[in-house]
Amino acid sequence: MLYPPGAPARIPLAAITGTNGKTTTSRMLAHILKSSGHVVGMTSTGGVQIDGRITVKGDMTGPQSAQIVLRDPTIDFAVLETARGGILRSGLGYSECDVAACINVTSDHMGLGGIDTLEQLAKVKETVVRIANDTVVLNADDKLCLKMADNCRAKHLCYITMDATHGLVREHIRANGRAVVLEKGINGDMITIYDNGAHIPLLWSHLIPATIEGKAMHNVQNAMFAAAMAFSFNTDLDAIRMGLRTFDTSFFQSPGRTNVYNEHPFKVILDYAHNQASFRAMADLADRL
């Protein structure tokens, strides 16, 4: 029988929104999942990818792009970057997801589509968070992201913080909640997962090539989001570690995102940065290089 009763009709779906970091986090998560044996369909500002191969080029972060991926019969996992513009124009392109993340909410595209304040922008991005069934991953260092926790229907809430002393996150951990925390250690900064009372040291941040020896703090945060989402899909811990340790910022693996060139007497950083927060991230990286 081609479609026996009770046969699964859906695949796991991860949705990623926010102002900055969506594309890199999507690429990181897709790489982790592919490394662990999945055939991943992904949408991002770089195009539609099926199993690591670009099938449609361009900014593909809207509902039509999501439908391209979800209609593909060869994939067993979907990672969908979901941007503000597509939501305002035509919605999401999917009715629910398993795991959703909002990385941050900062000023970008203001004055377009009737969005004039950060609070209005946050409400648009919250659309993704509201439809997650299993886990919502939120930036605890961003007040607008934190407010989204009040409107989650998901079974689990996972906080991401770069501040190991964050009071709310520590309280969440004590209540057996899930969190990914950047903690200082003798060898550097350790990305640590807390879940249901367990304390799991995952990986030193400087061992992730995309962080450029731990200097690209924005990519440390992106890696924490990717790890949290992969963990929420019950991905093997060693597969998460291996995925992050084999993801770099070369033009071939992450075009247009923190590509550093050393072929000249000076360093060149190629990045898609186009708003104040992303410019600050690039300036911070330049100071650390």
For the regions a language model picked out, list residue spans one by one.
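Glycine-rich phosphate/diphosphate-binding loops that line cofactor/substrate pockets in enzymes
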Residues: 8, 285-289
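Conserved lysine of the Walker
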Residues: 22-25, 222
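Short beta-strand-centered segment that lines the nucleotide-binding/catalytic pocket of NTP-utilizing
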Residues: 36-51
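Short, basic phosphate-binding NTP loop
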Residues: 1-15, 24-37, 245, 252
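Adenine nucleotide phosphate-binding catalytic loops in nucleotide-utilizing enzymes
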Residues: 115-122, 153-280
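Flexible active-site lid/hinge loop adjacent to a nucleotide/diphosphate
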Residues: 54-160, 164-172, 207, 276, ...
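Buried hydrophobic packing segments
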Residues: 29, 33, 69, 223-233, ...
